[in-house]
Amino acid sequence: MEYIKSNKVVLIGDGAVGSSYAFALVAQGVADELVIIDLDEDKVKGDVMDLNHAAPYGGSPVKIKAGSYKACHNADLVVITAGAAQKPGETRLDLIEKNTKIFKSIVSEVMASGFNGIFLVATNPVDVLTYVTQQVSGLPKEKVIGSGTILDTARFKYELAEEFGVSDRSVHGQIIGEHGDSELAVWSQANIAGQPLYQLLIDDPEKQHRIEEIFVNTRDAAYDIIQAKGATYYGIAMGLVHITKAILNNQNVVLTVSSRLEGEYGQEDVYIGVPTKINRQGAVEVFEIPLNDEEKTLFTRSVGILKEMQNKISHLIA
């Protein structure tokens, strides 16, 4: 009998994002095996039961179970959504330091299992924690990927699609940089069927104000959702499944994930959201979008902010 390799995913973190990802993964039939790890074992037990009951109506058969870090040893992909949430009065730096310590522990446990697959990081601040994951794991940069600006790009496409009355799948545009306040829209390359959208907006006096509004709506969407319902999880969960499919199915698609730069865009030693080819080997190639002078300045600023954060937590992962 011919041996057929199965696709095994281990999910670390069964909170709102993690459980949403698990559901979407099962619904779309992306993996053959899903193992869920979380400190709240009762929550995992309940979700495993619930997901197994949903699986018969999913995309394809999948084995779902609770597990420990030992399950990572033969996993193709380890997805990390675990981490501390920001508390009232807590600074962003406090949160970064707290999650860096958590990640150092998680990644060390995963590597101790003999894991040699690909890490996919979603916990915020995602760019910095992806950097932490690569530093602690010692894996090649191709094997450590962050969700980056994949959700921001989806939000940007949604806003543009609404503005121009077309399907979001017909919109070509990217948000790059930090997944956060310093991200930027690559307006100079955004288009529908080759028509430059920035020019269409700037040439229409009644729509010029929409350029800033579209970007602000994109950048600040998370704040609006959090204010309305407490957290964001469906969008990022679907984005993570999209990346998962690209990896497990060797799709060679280009997605705006958090990748490590080594000279691209004139930058190095930083994880940041940029268009990257994703396949079974991981993040194999960064694509350099032509940026205008303003976009180059904004991107350099975003890199500087991320490097400053990396430097502030470097002593925790030395």
Swiss-Prot record:
It comes from the Bacteria. Pathway: Fermentation; pyruvate fermentation to lactate; (S)-lactate from pyruvate: step 1/1. Substrate binds at residues 86, 92, 124-127, 152-155, 232. Allosterically activated by fructose 1,6-bisphosphate (FBP). One of its GO terms (cellular component) is cytoplasm. The active site is at residue 179. Beta-D-fructose 1,6-bisphosphate binds at residues 157, 172. One of its GO terms (biological process) is glycolytic process. It holds the Pfam family Ldh_1_C. Its EC number is 1.1.1.27. Keywords: Allosteric enzyme, Cytoplasm, NAD, Oxidoreductase, Phosphoprotein. It catalyses: (S)-lactate + NAD(+) = pyruvate + NADH + H(+). One of its GO terms (molecular function) is L-lactate dehydrogenase activity. It is found in: Cytoplasm. InterPro entries: L-lactate/malate_DH, L-lactate_DH, L-lactate_DH_AS, Lactate/malate_DH_C, Lactate/malate_DH_N, Lactate_DH/Glyco_Ohase_4_C, NAD(P)-bd_dom_sf. NAD(+) binds at residues 17, 38, 43, 69, 83-84, 105, 122-124, 147. It is an enzyme of class 1 (oxidoreductase). The modification Phosphotyrosine is found at residue 223. PANTHER family: L-2-HYDROXYCARBOXYLATE DEHYDROGENASE (NAD(P)(+)), L-LACTATE DEHYDROGENASE. Homotetramer. Catalyzes the conversion of lactate to pyruvate. Belongs to the LDH/MDH superfamily. LDH family. This is L-lactate dehydrogenase.
